[in-house]
Amino acid sequence: MPQRQPQNAHPADGIYFGLMSGTSMDGVDGVAVRFEAGKAPVVLAEAFVGFAQSLRDALFALQQPGDDEIDRESLAANALVTRYAVCCHELQRTAGLSRDEIRAIGVHGQTVRHRPERGYTRQINNPALLAELTQVDVIADFRSRDVAAGGHGAPLAPAFHATVFGAPGETRVVCNLGGISNITILPGEGGDVRGFDCGPANALLDEWATRHLGKPYDDGGKFAARGTVHAPLLDALLDEPYFAAPPPKSTGRDLFNPAWLDAKLAAFAQVAPEDVQATLTALTAVSVAREIAQHAAGCKAVFVCGGGARNPVLLDALRHALREAGVPATVDTTATLGVPPQQVEALAFAWLAYRFTARQPGNLATVTGAAGNRVLGALYPR
């Protein structure tokens, strides 16, 4: 039986699951979390379910135009959702929950195209299948309403960051180092929350590590630590017009992909693989630091989440880049604020499901450039 809510509870209060598979496409992060109006969210369980290489290959292939895309996308979506369901069952088991105790699952899907300038963003998913496999309400398709309102549909996490990480009197930056880097600027005194994508992060770092180490990522940044930053290559990478574009802006593998990197490398004589990795690490750090210097110069603290939070070489590079940019900010992970970095993105989509259930906006128009704040998502009942 569903748990009886206290008399002062909001009708949307309860336990939600959040699922996020990002641009690294290595697997899905999930959380089970209790939301109550006026209280901090309480995480009841977390899980990570990896993707088989065959699924990763299918998802990577869908990043670029190809033959028979509709069939390939549909099959990949079904395979993806079976892994989502495994994650949900693991969360349910770990937290000791019955299906009736779960209000809804908030699921992002897997981005395969992000072209808001053309009026669309595409996250492959099969929420109806997930509802069938879990017998829980599913809320999905969070980005398209923001795009329909003229926004970028990304980033969506800043509204959640403001709720959980904001602090009166202190300007903070939350930096997500996933496949793509993005920042949320939380003003300490008045002003609008802002946020946008800065550029590539693990998407290119992981690609290069896979190509030269045969491993899915550069464990602890050790590969990059063996190399030296190649300054002319770094300058060429930073010459990409996206870095100079003003916010609101968002990006993804449509731009920052292996073909982009190879085209840049073609202008240089042989560069040692470890030097390329060191340079890509510097690219991530410098592109983030420059945006912070330009848009949040008064920031005193940067809190990192995402997979890059586990890369000490990347975090040190970010500290160095901030000093070089004249920003005297400390760099820590969101664990310092009580939220493990690997949970943040999945928590954000559980929160978006909570907001949808309450029929409250999930975006920030000041972040995405939409015509206004909108209720995001679509419901697939169990």
UniProtKB/Swiss-Prot annotation:
Concerning its family, UniProt says: Belongs to the anhydro-N-acetylmuramic acid kinase family.
Per its record, how is this protein called by name?
Answer: Anhydro-N-acetylmuramic acid kinase
**A Pfam family reported for this protein in Swiss-Prot or TrEMBL:** AnmK
- GO molecular function terms listed in the Swiss-Prot or TrEMBL record: ATP binding; kinase activity; phosphotransferase activity, alcohol group as acceptor
Keyword line: ATP-binding, Carbohydrate metabolism, Kinase, Nucleotide-binding, Transferase
Instruction: Locate the residues binding ATP.
Output: 22-29
SUPFAM superfamilies xrefs: Actin-like ATPase domain
What organism is this sequence from? Burkholderia lata (strain ATCC 17760 / DSM 23089 / LMG 22485 / NCIMB 9086 / R18194 / 383)
The chain's disulfide connectivity reads: none
Query: Is-annotated flag, keyword NAD?
Result: no
Q: What processes in GO biological process is this protein linked to?
A: 1,6-anhydro-N-acetyl-beta-muramic acid catabolic process; amino sugar metabolic process; peptidoglycan turnover
Upper taxonomic classification of the species?
Bacteria, Pseudomonadati, Pseudomonadota, Betaproteobacteria, Burkholderiales
What the entry lists under InterPro entries is as follows: Anhydro_N_Ac-Mur_kinase, ATPase_NBD
Keyword Transmembrane annotated: no
- Pathway note: Amino-sugar metabolism; 1,6-anhydro-N-acetylmuramate degradation; Cell wall biogenesis; peptidoglycan recycling
Q: What is the annotated role of this protein in its UniProt record?
A: Catalyzes the specific phosphorylation of 1,6-anhydro-N-acetylmuramic acid (anhMurNAc) with the simultaneous cleavage of the 1,6-anhydro ring, generating MurNAc-6-P. Is required for the utilization of anhMurNAc either imported from the medium or derived from its own cell wall murein, and thus plays a role in cell wall recycling.
| Its EC number(s) | 2.7.1.170
Listed under catalytic activity are: 1,6-anhydro-N-acetyl-beta-muramate + ATP + H2O = N-acetyl-D-muramate 6-phosphate + ADP + H(+)
